[in-house]
Regions:
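Extracytoplasmic cell-surface/polysaccharide-interacting catalytic and binding patches
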Residues: 1-58, 62-198
């Protein structure tokens, strides 16, 4: 996805607001993704009063991804993984993807995006994020459903993807049908119109 240690990668902890947690000072994302994350989780707090979201994973180097992949193969005994992407193919290597969990009273628990937390799934596109790996797109993405994994793609793209129920693979394929002469017109959730092409 990207070169090792890209300069746009920043510590989430150093740039976050007070309405969520981060698993450590080394957990990082691209600045643009952190800014959108702050806006989204601040709005989530206003809507629900919850401050128990924790970012447990963000940017990973190729070597870190290889380690996770190898650990998964060892744990499952399989030749390939449907739970962990190959190094060089992980969204985390882009610096635009993160994993959520819940953290309350010193205890971390799984995030599944249900109940009041469904607000994030319903509104993440307003902040440029998409729920990346859903059960209904498993055959297309090749990755099992991960209700905790979000990817920053930008507002107009996220709005289109959510409104039309397409995953990133489908969206990128669709965009190849559009050019500067004949762009895809996307009306964002706030009424702003974007012209998008491949």
């Amino acid at each position: 996805y990207v070169e090792e240690n890209p300069s746009e990668i920043v510590s989430i902890y150093d740039h976050k607001t007070d309405n969520y947690h981060v698993s450590g000072t080394e957990t990082s994302l691209r600045q643009q993704a952190v800014d959108a994350l702050n806006q989204m989780l601040d709005a989530f707090y206003v809507a629900t009063g919850h401050q128990d979201m924790i970012v447990i994973s963000g940017y990973r180097t190729n070597a870190q991804q290889q380690e996770l992949y190898d650990e998964d193969l060892q744990a499952t005994g399989e030749q390939t993984s449907t739970r962990v992407a190959l190094p060089g193919h992980s969204e985390h290597e882009s610096g635009y993807s993160l994993d959520f969990s819940l953290y309350e009273d010193g205890v971390q628990s799984d995030y599944d995006g249900t109940g009041e937390y469904a607000w994030i799934n319903e509104n993440c596109s307003h902040y440029g994020y998409v729920l990346r790996y859903t059960e209904d797109k498993q055959d297309t993405t090749g990755i099992q459903a991960e209700p905790w994994h979000y990817r920053y793609v930008g507002q107009p793209h996220a709005a289109y993807m959510q409104e039309n129920n397409v995953c990133l693979e489908e969206y990128l394929t669709l965009l190849k049908n559009y050019s500067a002469d004949v762009p895809l017109s996307i009306t964002n959730w706030d009424g702003e119109i974007y012209q998008v092409y491949y």
